[in-house]
Swiss-Prot record:
Keywords in alphabetical order: Cell membrane, Disulfide bond, G-protein coupled receptor, Glycoprotein, Membrane, Receptor, Transducer, Transmembrane, Transmembrane helix
Cystine connections: C102-C180
Cellular compartments per GO CC: external side of plasma membrane
PROSITE patterns listed in its UniProt record: G_PROTEIN_RECEP_F1_1, G_PROTEIN_RECEP_F1_2
Glycosylation sites per record: N16
TM stretches of this protein: 33-59, 69-89, 104-125, 144-164, 188-215, 232-259, 276-293
Extracellular topology ranges: 1-32, 90-103, 165-187, 260-275
Protein encoded by which gene: CXCR6
Cytoplasmic side: 60-68, 126-143, 216-231, 294-342
Protein name: C-X-C chemokine receptor type 6
Family stated for the protein in its record: Belongs to the G-protein coupled receptor 1 family.
Protein's job: Receptor for the C-X-C chemokine CXCL16. Used as a coreceptor by SIVs and by strains of HIV-2 and m-tropic HIV-1.
Keyword Nucleotide-binding: no
Amino acid sequence: MAEHDYHEDYGLNSFNDSSQEEHQDFLQFRKVFLPCMYLVVFVCGLVGNSLVLVISIFYHKLQSLTDVFLVNLPLADLVFVCTLPFWAYAGIHEWIFGQVMCKTLLGVYTINFYTSMLILTCITVDRFIVVVKATKAYNQQAKRMTWGKVICLLIWVISLLVSLPQIIYGNVFNLDKLICGYHDKEISTVVLATQMTLGFFLPLLAMIVCYSVIIKTLLHAGGFQKHRSLKIIFLVMAVFLLTQTPFNLVKLIRSTHWEYYAMTSFHYTIIVTEAIAYLRACLNPVLYAFVSLKFRKNFWKLVKDIGCLPYLGVSHQWKSSEDNSKTFSASHNVEATSMFQL
C-alpha cells in the first residue's frame, strides 16, 4: 500500500526477535487481511460516496457553502477508494502494473487523501462560522459560496503540490517481490511530516477548537435540535479519533523507533490500524451527508426515480419533519447545514 515504503518492507526481512515461523504467519495474515479490508472499504466507499455525489449534483443542488464541500469531499473519497483494488491485488501477489501506474496511483491516492482531510477541516470551520457567527454567515451566503469554491480549488492544488514527492520518487522495487513505493529515507521523513500535519493534526486541532466553541454555543441555545446536534458533534469527533489516531500514533512511533521494525507484533499493529484508518472513506457519507434530513429525503426521491423501492408514502413524513427543521434554522438565522438541518 502507499503507506508502506521501502524501509518498512526491508524491516520485514530483517527481524531479530521473531522466529521465521512467526514472520511467515504475519506475511500470510497481511496477504489475506489487508486485501479483504481494502475491498470492503472500496465497495462501501464506492456505494456511499457515489450516492452522495449523485444526490448532491442532481437533487440537492449547490445551495450553501456546506453543499460545495459535500461535493468535493465524496469526490475525493471516491477517487481514493478506487485506488484500493490495485493495492489489494499487489498485496496478494505483487505489483504488476508498471512504473507509470505506480507513480500515478501513488499520486492519485495521496492527492485525494490530503484533499479529503483538508475539506473535513473546512467543513469544521464552516460549521463554527454558521453557528457562532450565524447572522453574519446568513447575510453573506453569496460571498461565502464564491469563497468556498475558490478554497476548494486551492485545496486540490495544494494537495497536488504536497503529493509531488510520492509522484516523483515513487518507483517499483524488487525485494522478495515487486512493490510500489519509495525508498529514500529523507523523502519518507518529509512525506510523514506532511501527512501527520495536514492529514491529522490540522483537522484534529480544527475540530477541538471549533467544536468546543460550538458546543458551548449550543448549550446556551434553546430548541429541540440542540441535543441531536450535540450528539452528531460527539459522533464526528469520536469517529475521527478512533479511526485516525491509532494509525498516526503508530506511524509516529515507527519513524522514531526503528528497532520496532524487528518486532513482528508491531507490524500486525501497523496493518490493522491502517485498515481502521481507511474506514473514514466509508463513514464520511454517513457523518457529513446522511445526517441531513433534506439529504435523506432526496435519497428517497432517488430510490423512487430509479424504481428500486416503492415510495411507501414517506414523502409527507419527510416534508413535515423538514418544515420543523426549517423553522428551527430560520428562527436562529442559521444557514442550512448537514449538521443542523436534521
